[in-house]
């Protein structure tokens, strides 16, 4: 029903509870109502009508007309809904600024922990990363910290979704060799990766397919374990290893792909 949809929208987007939304719809429909009248024309229980109408007035959706029996009329929907959106935008803006300031303060406070002499990953050189979000964060971290060399054999996700992070790492001085699957080339048209390849700022080749997508940044290696079910549910398991011997093994495999790949 149309009435149910109006109530649903008011609840979902304009911070009214169920009884408030029903009461406001009734006020808009009837114009002016007393608490008793509201109970008779809406699904708001009689014992709750006074509280509900006062709450609507406090939120700016209704105006009371004092008298022997208080009457309430609605604020025009166009006015109150627009006002709500404007106030919400301002509130979100303030919250965003507060979060940015909190982030900066936290980073400043955590600097001594980040820059400590203790190795960042302790004695651990192997981490298991699960889920697309965590894998993305780990990849971003690798691009931020790489100093010399990036070797990327990519079947789609990194080149498309983390292009800016990759380009920034190259701009900061890292040399990059990238192999992409040929099916990905069309999606890279007009991209920064393609632009940098044409300008000689990175080396780019394409291969029909490769069994082992990988990312190597200096001594760090990141690769996914094959699990189609996990990939379907965006919970693929990836392994991060920081060890020059493992790096050498993966780099040898990357070089095999590189020799077979065609220059773009």
Curated annotation (Swiss-Prot):
The keyword Cytoplasm applies. The keyword Electron transport does not apply. GO terms for cellular component: chromosome; cytoplasm. Disruption phenotype: Slight growth delay compared to wild-type. No fibrous chromosomal DNA isolated from cells, DNA condensation is normal. Chromatin DNA is more sensitive to micrococcal nuclease. Alters gene expression levels of about 10% of the genome. It is found in: Cytoplasm; Chromosome. Its main location: cytoplasm. Keywords: Chromosome, Coiled coil, Cytoplasm, DNA-binding, Repressor, Transcription, Transcription regulation. GO terms for molecular function: DNA binding. Residues 81-113 form a coiled coil. NCBIfam families: tran_reg_TrmBL2. Belongs to the transcriptional regulator TrmB family. An abundant chromosomal protein that seems to be involved in both genome architecture and transcription repression. Incubation with DNA in vitro gives fibrous structures 14.2 +/- 2.1 nm in thickness (naked DNA is 1.83 +/- 0.37 nm); does not significantly compact DNA. Binds to both coding and non-coding regions; binding within gene promoters correlates with decreased transcript levels, while binding within coding regions does not. This is DNA-binding HTH-type transcriptional repressor TrmBL2.
């Amino acid at each position: 029903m149309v009435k149910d949809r109006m109530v649903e929208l008011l609840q979902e987007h304009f911070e009214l509870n169920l009884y408030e939304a029903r009461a406001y719809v009734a006020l808009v429909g009837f114009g002016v109502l007393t608490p008793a009248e509201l109970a008779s024309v809406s699904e708001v229980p009689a014992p709750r009508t006074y509280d509900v109408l006062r709450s609507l007035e406090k939120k700016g959706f209704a105006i009371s007309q004092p008298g022997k029996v208080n009457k309430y009329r609605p604020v025009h929907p166009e006015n109150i809904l627009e006002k709500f959106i404007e106030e919400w935008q301002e509130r979100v803006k303030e919250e965003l600024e507060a979060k940015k300031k909190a982030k900066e303060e936290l980073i400043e406070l955590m600097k001594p922990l980040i820059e400590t002499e203790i190795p960042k990953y302790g004695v651990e050189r192997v981490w298991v990363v699960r889920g697309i979000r965590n894998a993305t964060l780990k990849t971003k971290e690798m691009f931020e910290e790489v100093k010399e060399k990036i070797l990327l054999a990519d079947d789609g996700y990194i080149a498309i979704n983390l292009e800016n992070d990759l380009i920034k790492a190259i701009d900061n001085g890292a040399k990059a060799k990238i192999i992409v699957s040929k099916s990905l080339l069309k999606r890279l048209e007009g991209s920064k990766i393609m632009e940098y390849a044409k300008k000689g700022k990175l080396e780019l080749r394409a291969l029909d397919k490769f069994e082992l997508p990988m990312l190597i940044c200096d001594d760090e290696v990141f690769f996914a374990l094959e699990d189609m079910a996990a990939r379907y549910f965006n919970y693929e398991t990836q392994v991060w290893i920081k060890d020059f011997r493992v790096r050498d093994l993966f780099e040898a495999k990357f070089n095999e792909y590189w020799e077979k790949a065609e220059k773009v």
